[in-house]
Amino acid sequence: MDSITTAASVVAAGLAVGLGAIGPGIGQGSAAQGAVEGIARQPEAEGKIRGTLLLSFAFMESLTIYGLVVALVLLFANPFAG
Amino acid sequence: MEPLLASTSVTSDANSRNGDGDLCSSRETSERLKLSEDLESSGNNSGDLSAEYVLLQLRIFRINLVVTAFAAVVSILFVDLNAAISLLLGACSGIIYLRLLAKNIGSLGKSSSSVGKVQLIVPVALVLVVAKVPDLHLLPSLVGFLLYKPSLIIQFLLEPYARKNLVN
């Protein structure tokens, strides 16, 4: 792998993780805030709120995982490496 | 096999509370009894309330196992054995990831004020292992890892029926 490909892969890996984590991070923060407020306001619905939070977190965090996987593939299994 | 338990385990103490021993012959029946009590009464403690969450995780775990078995059989029949092994490895990672996520969400608001990121180690370790072992393939392992998403969707679709059965 030549030096330009290596440098571009490292930069792209950093961007994939960094940019890919911004949106889910904001979304998870607001979802957790809403869930904790909901549990505090309505403790009898705690199980249902936590279940819904688990579903939404699993789907939101998969966006971060996509970026993470792209970054790891670029770093450890780069298809552009000669 | 250990289910996806987050914080508190479901104990079958409904028998001792109610005194109707014939209804609580199996563990699942006692879990259902306890959950229907939880749904009916609103003034219980947090341990009783989290039983619904534990049962939800158990349902997701069972559906995940069924989806994983189906995907493994399909990949053995139509692709090859290495792809099926990679898919199974990814599916195991997905189950561990979901368990860690559920554990973090279970402790949200009790012992921690934010959801931890420990579960993200699992896909990192999966990709690293698949990249190092030459017999494993990356794409089937990622597909196997993401099998928890159809399980969650199926669980979401089946939830009204499960809730109806619990109330009845």
From Swiss-Prot, chain A:
Chief site of localization: membrane
CDD domains the record matches: ATP-synt_Fo_c_ATPH
Keywords: ATP synthesis, CF(0), Hydrogen ion transport, Ion transport, Lipid-binding, Membrane, Thylakoid, Transmembrane, Transmembrane helix, Transport
Pfam name, any one: ATP-synt_C
Record Gene3D superfamilies: F1F0 ATP synthase subunit C
Membrane topology qualifier: Multi-pass membrane protein
Stated name of the protein: ATP synthase subunit c
